[in-house]
Amino acid sequence: MNKIISAMTLAILFTSSAVAAPSNHVGINYSFDNVVGTQLEFDIAKAASNKPVSIQLFWKSYQQRLNSNNTWNTTGIGIAGIYDLTSVVKVNKSVHPYVGLGLMSVSYTWAGFGIRQNYTGVDSGLYITGGVRYNFTPQVDADFNLNNFGGLTAGANFKF
């Protein structure tokens, strides 16, 4: 957990000068596995020899209520490097395929009754994503991706 927070802090510090760039965005998303999430993404192309690379900080949460007494919660936070594939794959200018790889920390909570009343745990691992963004307007993108925390996901990104 401390490694993730340290990495997020460093990413924000090193990309803070890029906050005014038009390709930075904040996004919200929802998956078909009932995961809700949000992310901040900062363009670091200038720091990466003008490669189409960005840093994404994300938070995702899943809650399943099994009955009136039992609830399972999973929350993930992390950081990922995102590579825009438009320099490799020639598509419409409004379409931006991408892939990403990063680290995430996941916390689990089981609340219930009986022999196993409560359980909490923390784990960490790789975060893998790939998808496509479609520019609706210069300020709004639709984002469709597949990742290993939430599965098939749809969302919207708002550039700042």
Feature map (PLM): residue ranges:
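Short loop/turn motifs that connect adjacent beta-strands in outer-membrane beta-barrel proteins
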Residues: 20-23, 45-52, 86-96, 139
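Residue-level signature of outer-membrane beta-barrel architecture
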Residues: 30, 42-46, 81-87, 132-134, ...
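Mid-chain, structured segments of secreted extracytoplasmic proteins
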Residues: 63-107
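Outer-membrane beta-barrel "beta-signal"
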Residues: 149-160
